[in-house]
Amino acid sequence: MKLLASSLKLPNGAILQNRIAKSAMSESMGTLQNAPTKNLIKAYEVWSKGGAGLLITGNVMIDSRALGEPRNVVVENRSNFKLLQDWAKSCEGTGTHIWPQLNLSLIHI
């Protein structure tokens, strides 16, 4: 238990507050226009308050022509910028890192 609770310095210099992480999963909680939803942002806020050191998001696509599945969040321009900022800030003050799982599904293009 002590090891799980101990901090971890990664080779890139990031320091995780502990060794507990939520791995990537495909939440499919974006809008039909592929923006983050308030429910998605709230989920990460709640998970961060659970004390994990790292939350890895589900699929964040970089091209709307190449979705992994419907309702993936897409980052290809600034149209969803405010909601993306809110999502990134959902872990503020908890010490939890949130890292996006960036994807490009070339098979769909």
Where are these regions (language model features)?
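N-terminal capping/small domains of soluble enzymes
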Residues: 1-103
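Conserved small/polar residues in nucleotide/adenosyl-binding loops
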Residues: 108-109
